[in-house]
Structure formats: C-alpha cells, structure tokens
A protein has these predicted regions:
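Amphipathic alpha-helical hairpins
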Residues: 1-167
Length: 167
C-alpha cells in the first residue's frame, strides 16, 4: 500500500467481501438452528448484514470510490468452519451451541475489523465514514451479545444436558 488511505480502502474492500459471504452463510446457519430464538437471531443479523453492505458502499463513496471486494481469507475460513460444524452436528444436542460458537467467531472478527477501520477513518479525517463504521461496529457488538445471551440461557445448557433444543 502506498498510503494510509490505500490501506484503509483495501481493508474496507476486504470487509465488503466478508459481508457478501456472510449474506450467503447466515441463511444456512439459521436453517440449521433448532432453537427458535437462535434461528431468529441469525435471520435478524442477515438483514443487518445486508445493511452493512450498503453502509460500506457509503464509506467507499466518502472516499470518492466505487465499492470493491477483496477476497477475505479470514471470513472464508470462519464460514468453512461453520459449514463443518453444521455437517458434524446435525441432529446433535450440540448443534445450537456449535452454531453460536461459529457465529461468535465471525462477530469477533468483524468487531476487530470495524473498530480498526473506524479508527483509521478518524485518523484520515473522514468523520462521516467513521460514524458509519461506528454504527456497524455497534450492530456487530449487539449481535455478539445476543449470541452470548442465547448461549448462556439455553443453548449451552441444552447441549450439556444432551437435549436438542427446539425439536
């Protein structure tokens, strides 16, 4: 990268790709969930994720750029693990706990990425872009908190007890 702005835009392209991939993965995770609340959480986050793509388009626009995608190996690895979890845990009491674990891996990656991008946008003097990235960051943190709540109140308990929740 030649400049900080180049690094920033390259990283935004990485996250734009990541969000596109999550739009494809979240319906599979929702379908695999046997707990109604977890199913709903994945569906709600799908709508937010589609919104994140639009918000990232606004970030590109703030820099006078058209949206671009750059292959994000990190999210592809996380999604591959999620698909493996679904395959290995179908009809198992652990399916919902495993899906939460996979979902939180994605959320934590996004939280780290959007926090860094927000800080870079501030440093580049792009307050509007920083504000948009902060909105996305808040939504990712809320999604992570929802998954934690579901894990602690039912899904991990069901997995430990050997009960398939919701079936």
């Amino acid at each position: 990268m030649k400049t900080m702005e180049d690094l920033f835009l390259d990283s935004v392209a990485d996250m734009y790709y990541a969000e596109k991939q999550l739009v494809k993965a979240l319906p599979k995770m929702a379908k695999a969930a046997t707990d109604d609340d977890l199913h709903s959480a994945f569906e709600s986050h799908l709508a937010e994720t589609e919104g994140h793509m639009r918000k990232l388009e606004d970030v590109f626009a703030a820099f006078g750029q058209n949206p671009k995608s750059k292959k994000c190996r990190a999210i592809l690895g996380i999604i591959d693990e999620a698909e493996e979890i679904i395959s290995d845990n179908k009809k198992s009491p652990t399916i919902n706990a495993a899906l939460i674990f996979a979902g939180q891996k994605a959320e934590h990656y996004e939280i780290a990425s959007y926090g860094g991008l927000r800080d870079w946008a501030r440093g580049l003097g792009k307050a509007q872009a920083a504000s948009v990235l902060d909105e996305i960051l808040d939504e990712e943190k809320a999604a992570d908190s929802k998954l934690t709540e579901l894990a602690e109140t039912c899904c991990n308990i069901g997995a430990k007890a050997g009960v398939v929740v919701g079936t």
